[in-house]
């Protein structure tokens, strides 16, 4: 299912691209630790292609290549760390959703600031398979656009992040984005 990005037009895409390229040029752009060395090398171009002409769906399809991912992942169950083979399709969809939404929110927030808009509303762009209570509590909130812009990735990047920061998307697989009020 595709996300509903209310203002995903050429103007927003252009700002998304500018913001993405600025982070890339900063020397320490975010890269998922789940990506392989090759995945980290090609991710930037895949993201640029999605920003210019695609969506989270086209990005997920581009990422759905086992050579772009570390083959194993660690997870914790009942307090015990374990390893399992990575589900490439699931990992591709999760990263694509989170990254495309992150850049959409960043680009739209910049656009709204440039237009003098002070507040925005958090909304769910699509219905997730499961809803995190922590994420769901933000549905419908009216938020200061500058807070959204300033807290870009603040919960997790740069590491260790600020777990108390308010960021949209709130975390991996979050289906929340913003719109003008």
Where are these regions (language model features)?
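Domain-core detector
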Residues: 1-170, 179-181
